Amino acid sequence: MVIEGVVMRKIIYLVLIFNSVLFLSQIRAKIIAIKDGDTVVALLENKQQETLRLAEVDCPENSQPFGKSAKQFTSSQVFGRPIIFYRINKDRYRRTIAKIFYENEKYLSAEIIKAGFGWWYYKASKNIQLKEYENSARKKKLGLWKDKNAISPWEFRKVKNTHQKIKPITGKR
């Protein structure tokens, strides 16, 4: 009985490892739409579409200052072009969080941060190089860093959500 349990645990462990390796394998695709600075739509080789949320970066929302500029930058880098991506996880909106590479191993999240169109998303990244890219873009006042009062997307969303929850009372009581 104990031996069967040990064998079963090993089998489950191997299945989990195998699935993890498959999840992290590289996928070839073509970018067919840009939703915002950090979200794109990829056309896979099997003709399926997949929405990809870029890993390790957070760009301004479209309605935020520099949001459209971030979207344009991302478009200029990958729209209509072949890419390779790695699935990392799923977010709460069921989008695939992905690391996207293009043009001889350029890492899209890093390029966005270097150009000053996104924040290093330190809450979900241990890649200190991205922090250095952000600091460099800040010093050079690139992209959104031209605005000394730039508000991070997570702060912008927090304020926006707070205002949406507080509805004014109108009419007679």
Task: Enumerate the language-model features and the residues they cover.
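Small beta-barrel nucleic-acid-binding modules, primarily SNase/OB-fold domains
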Residues: 2-13, 18-173
